[in-house]
């Protein structure tokens, strides 16, 4: 049985709701039984080269989970530390010969441990109060915009103005993008609720931090000739809460999104962010399993979800672009494979095809395109030095291959690589593919 070295702190009450019950021992046994302890995971683990420890790889974590749910005593804090020390890049799961559901094991383990040991107060506020509410997110962005001008130092980079934390903050010189005065959704004229053939789910980061991405995606989607509407008051997709173990907050976001999108019944739901997409296509079904009242609706919603690049190719939007003049784009433009989008969902070729057709001769395969950027959501907060080391290697390899612009389709990857570029090569630009598509159309 799991034991704790301290008295369990009160966490959120997440019992009694289907899809949110603590995982039973037999469920973990079923998930972990497929692991043959072959060690393939160690050869591809993003963290192992930094940690050099068995506990950092899937095999080690699964062994700990098995021990915790056996007759042997298990230390809850030690297991929580081990399961938290993972970027969730999914490389181990994709390369596993037995297809062990590593990410599911880790996410469910984190959730059960969060219930036992409690969820930190700041996470309860962010995941339970801010992320589900558009009003709360807007208020948070307004406060953060004012605070960064007072406490942080301005740093110009190739990807735009950033702010750097002073060393006194203990954040090792981390940079963050300058927050705009208005969010993407805040810049739209008043409109109706979700409707139309196609719905754009812009996501929190592309609404508040990089509104130019939301705007570029919206403007280029409209060229498809389809009726496009924006999910204006959507809760967060729920992924940050889920991977942090806050099952209840994640479930609240997921249930609201499924109900709203099911009622609207669009043909397609388009996601500029690969992390939001993987939440809808796969992870939300961990929370709404067979037997949950919303399971059927969740499956139908998931089937309609598509990434931005795939939608452009489906609707042949790029056929309207003229041939691009040779040398129009300054320097080589390459595509970074986001772990969630390219790895988990297999959507790498689509992004490359959009990029080739957009920038023409300037496209070049990115050196180290498949390398993880090291962001990992809350992992970047939990262990910034390690996250930054992995990220700096990523952008250094790409720049060393001649890249002047890195294009991708994940908000976390863009946040991370812009931060790393500000450290290693401020001239290196990191953009979303929608920004390049929008620029190409504006230059017609």
Language-model-detected regions and their locations in the chain:
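Ferredoxin-like iron-sulfur electron-transfer modules
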Residues: 20-37, 66-88, 329, 334, ...
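Glycine- and acidic
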Residues: 28-30, 46, 91, 199-203, ...
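Conserved glycine-rich FAD pyrophosphate-binding loop
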Residues: 1-30
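Alpha-helix capping and helix-loop boundary segments enriched in small/acidic/polar residues
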Residues: 33, 52-56, 241-248
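Iron-sulfur cluster-binding cysteine motifs and their immediate structural context
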Residues: 36, 40-67, 80, 85-112, ...
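Iron-sulfur cluster-binding electron-transfer modules in prokaryotic oxidoreductases
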Residues: 3, 102-444
């Amino acid at each position: 049985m799991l034991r704790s070295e301290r008295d369990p702190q009160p966490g959120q009450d997440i019992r009694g709701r289907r899809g949110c019950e603590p995982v039973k021992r037999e469920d973990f046994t079923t998930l972990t039984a497929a692991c043959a302890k072959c060690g393939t995971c160690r050869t591809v683990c993003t963290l192992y080269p930094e940690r050099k420890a068995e506990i950092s790889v899937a095999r080690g974590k699964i062994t700990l989970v098995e021990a915790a749910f056996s007759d042997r005593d298990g230390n809850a804090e030690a297991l929580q530390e081990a399961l938290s020390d993972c970027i969730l890049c999914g490389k181990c799961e994709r390369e596993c010969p037995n297809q062990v559901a590593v990410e599911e094991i880790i996410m469910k383990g984190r959730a059960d441990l969060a219930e036992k040991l409690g969820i930190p107060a700041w996470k309860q506020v962010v995941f339970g109060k801010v992320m589900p509410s558009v009003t709360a997110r807007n208020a948070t962005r307004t406060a953060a915009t004012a605070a960064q001008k007072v406490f942080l130092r301005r740093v110009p980079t190739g990807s735009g103005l950033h702010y750097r934390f002073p060393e006194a903050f203990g954040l090792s010189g981390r940079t963050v993008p300058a927050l705009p005065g208005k969010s993407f959704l805040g810049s739209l004229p008043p409109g109706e609720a979700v409707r139309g053939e196609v719905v754009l789910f812009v996501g929190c980061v592309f609404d508040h931090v990089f509104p130019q991405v939301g705007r570029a995606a919206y403007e280029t989607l409209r060229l498809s000739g389809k009726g496009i509407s924006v999910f204006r008051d959507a809760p967060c997709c729920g992924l940050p809460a889920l991977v942090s173990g806050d099952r209840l907050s994640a479930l609240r976001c997921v249930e609201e999104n499924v109900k709203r999108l099911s009622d609207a019944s669009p043909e397609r739901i388009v996601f500029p962010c690969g992390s939001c997409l993987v939440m809808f296509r796969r992870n939300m079904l961990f929370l709404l399993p067979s037997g949950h009242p919303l399971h059927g609706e969740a499956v139908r919603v998931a089937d309609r979800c598509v990434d931005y690049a795939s939608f452009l190719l489906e609707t042949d939007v790029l056929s309207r672009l003229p041939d691009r003049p040779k040398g129009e784009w300054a320097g080589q433009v390459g595509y970074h494979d986001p772990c969630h989008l390219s790895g988990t969902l297999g959507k790498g070729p689509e992004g490359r095809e959009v990029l080739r057709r957009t920038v023409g001769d300037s496209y070049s395969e990115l050196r180290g395109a498949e390398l993880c950027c090291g962001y990992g959501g809350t992992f970047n907060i939990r262990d910034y030095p390690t996250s930054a080391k992995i990220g700096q290697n990523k952008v250094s390899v790409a720049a060393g291959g001649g890249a002047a612009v890195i294009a991708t389709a994940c908000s976390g990857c863009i946040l991370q690589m812009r931060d790393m570029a500000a450290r290693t090569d401020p001239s290196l630009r990191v953009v979303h593919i929608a920004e390049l598509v929008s620029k190409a159309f504006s230059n017609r």
